[in-house]
Curated annotation (Swiss-Prot):
Molecular functions per Gene Ontology: nickel cation binding
Family the UniProt entry places it in: Belongs to the UreD family.
Main localisation: cytoplasm
Protein name: Urease accessory protein UreD
């Protein structure tokens, strides 16, 4: 029996459509049914990850396993933002563990909704992605240092994220770690963080693509119509892909840019732009 809260496997049916062939769920995670939102691309399955709880609480330990078999194509997003609630006892925290495997010719677009770090929240997140050399990946996350609309800002305890991408033989392709302090952050009043508190991270892996050309497109903030965004990109070791980090004053700006970035990648591979994703 799976020890994960959500265990998903996807494969292609005889028509070439991506379907869910295995699904095991326990509270509080659920998976939506498959949506076919693009009539020009019946191969791609559009899925929502649903958390039926109010959010992450002290002591929560959520695990998700996602396996894409050969030739599958998946767009996965959350139904709503991930709220990390107060954990005033310094010995408590919440944990999330994500394990992903993407086989040859498969494609994963994982566009997460924002993680909102409430006052006194503490979250540790690990993401492990095993990627075939002929697999494609678009991965994004957004981090909010509080309920900004309420004036809550950097009152959380800490956020720790560790991400690792390996080959199918477990050779490390890329490793990244973010340790973001909240209350104890000595830089939170600096102009950079005060003016642009919304943080986003993006990873793009496109085999056999010209990463220099793609990087130039993704850094074109005029074309993205996001002139106020701060953005930096770098090519991953051994030309495995691209890492981008962005800062913005508001969440809609970041979401707008992520959509632009995903459409750039789609256009590069002769796919239609992202259809409307209802939330």
């Amino acid at each position: 029996m799976s020890t994960n809260n959500l265990d998903i496997k996807l494969n292609c049916n005889s028509s070439g459509q991506t379907i869910v062939t295995h699904q095991y769920t326990t509270h509080p995670l659920r998976l939506s049914g498959v949506f076919r939102l693009d009539t020009t691309d019946p191969r791609t399955a559009y899925l929502y990850l649903i958390n039926t709880s109010p959010g992450l609480l002290a002591g929560d330990n959520l695990s998700l396993s996602l396996q894409l078999e050969k030739g599958t194509s998946v767009y996965l997003t959350d139904q709503a933002a991930i709220k990390v609630h107060a954990m005033p006892m310094t010995t408590t925290k919440a944990n999330t563990n994500i394990k992903i495997k993407v086989e040859a010719g498969a494609r994963l677009e994982l566009v997460a909704e924002p993680i909102i770090l409430f006052a006194d929240a503490a979250l540790e997140q690990t993401t492990y992605i095993q990627l075939h050399s002929r697999a494609e990946l678009f991965w994004s996350e957004i981090i909010l240092p509080g309920r900004l609309a309420r004036g809550e800002w950097y009152e959380f305890r800490y956020y720790l994220s560790q991400l690792e991408i390996t080959s199918m033989t477990e050779e490390i392709c890329f490793r990244d770690a973010i340790h973001l302090e909240g209350k104890q952050n000595i830089f939170k009043h600096r102009d950079l963080f005060a003016a642009k508190p919304v943080l986003a991270n993006l990873i793009v892996v496109q085999p056999h693509s010209d990463l220099e050309v793609l990087s130039q497109k993704l850094e074109n903030l005029e074309a993205a119509n996001c002139p106020d965004l701060l953005l930096g990109s770098s090519i991953l070791p051994n030309n495995k892909g691209l890492l981008l980090r962005a800062l913005a004053s508001k969440t809609p700006q970041i979401k707008k840019y992520i959509k632009y970035a995903l459409n750039c990648v789609r256009n590069l591979t002769n796919r239609s732009s992202l259809p409307y994703i209802s939330k």
